[in-house]
């Protein structure tokens, strides 16, 4: 299937007025709306594609942009095989841009306000069962204790004389440190339900160990305080005490989690860590960090947490976003009923 952004004609340089409008819109998203770099890149890429299409239709400045250009661009995206969710996002990007241009006085009317909203089908998230999650974390805790003991034993021993022995010791120390880090990463994801970008942005100073909470900076640069369970705090402390010093370099800064080169852990690596840990534990469901977030929320609701508390913990701006987890819990209840009730 052709990529949704692939058009029949190669894109050319935008006319100066359109290029300036795109740059202003990108600054607005980044500085005024405080959107994440990922969202800014996605919206800017969408609008760049839309303006390239408009330029080919003879539009040289924002004031020439109208509803036909918007609809024509979205029609091309649909014909190119864009997924329903992608089309919905690109429509939202177009509406955001024209509203921005209208407020700036570049447009006499806002054509995006007349653009229909494409409703996406929200799929129920994949979640792990509580016994599956417990088995994974129990195994990681055991591996973490073994790694901690290995680092302590290596530190207490005599320095190796031969270069090869020193290299082997360093390699084993790094391997043990990575095991401690990975255990803390998964424990913290499950304990808090935070997003992968939020976890990667954490510093040790964000934790209040006495109150068992962590300060998280989420979407829109909004800060919230999230509870952390004892096992997760124990895993984090184990990593900070025994693991992090083995990976830290001058470039590490205050980052909580580090990659093997000593720099702040990036979201891509964090996703890989979670996928690998679950696969090694024999979990067949495809659940990365976002799946663990879904799992944490579902388990909270199954345990009796109220929806508003879960909304606050996850950092959802709308309660409707959190309500999907109630559907997950109901579906699981229905499945259990069908399996267990004699007259189901």
Model-assigned labels for residue ranges:
Residues 1-344:
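Conserved catalytic core of the tyrosine transesterase superfamily
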């Amino acid at each position: 299937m052709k990529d949704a952004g692939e058009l029949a004609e190669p894109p050319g340089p935008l006319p100066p007025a359109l290029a300036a409008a795109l740059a202003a819109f990108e600054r607005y998203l980044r500085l005024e709306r405080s959107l994440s770099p990922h969202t800014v890149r996605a919206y800017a890429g969408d609008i760049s594609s839309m303006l390239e299409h408009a330029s080919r239709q003879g539009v040289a400045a924002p004031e020439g942009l109208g509803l036909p250009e918007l609809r024509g661009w979205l029609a091309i995206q649909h014909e190119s095989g864009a997924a329903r969710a992608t089309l919905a996002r690109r429509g939202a990007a177009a509406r955001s841009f024209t509203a921005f241009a209208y407020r700036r006085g570049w447009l006499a009317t806002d054509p995006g306000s007349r653009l229909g909203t494409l409703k996406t089908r929200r799929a129920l998230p994949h979640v792990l069962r509580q016994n599956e999650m417990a088995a994974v974390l129990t195994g990681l805790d055991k591996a973490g204790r073994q790694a901690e003991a290995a680092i302590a034993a290596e530190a207490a021993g005599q320095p190796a004389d031969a270069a090869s022995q020193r290299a082997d010791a360093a390699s084993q120390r790094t391997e043990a440190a990575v095991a401690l880090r990975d255990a803390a990463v998964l424990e913290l994801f499950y304990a808090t339900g935070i997003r992968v970008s939020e976890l990667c942005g954490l510093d040790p100073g964000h934790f209040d160990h006495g109150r068992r909470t962590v300060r998280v900076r989420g979407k829109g640069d909004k800060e919230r305080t999230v509870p952390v369970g004892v096992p997760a705090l124990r895993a984090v402390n184990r990593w900070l005490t025994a693991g992090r010093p083995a990976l830290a370099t001058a470039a590490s800064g205050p980052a909580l989690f580090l990659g093997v080169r000593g720099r702040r852990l990036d979201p891509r690596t964090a996703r890989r860590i979670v996928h690998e840990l679950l696969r090694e534990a024999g979990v067949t469901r495809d659940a990365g960090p976002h799946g663990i977030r879904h799992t944490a929320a579902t388990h909270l609701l199954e345990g009796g947490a109220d929806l508003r508390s879960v909304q606050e913990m996850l950092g959802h701006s709308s309660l409707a976003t959190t309500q999907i987890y109630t559907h997950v819990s109901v579906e699981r209840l229905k499945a259990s009923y069908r399996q267990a009730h004699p007259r189901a």
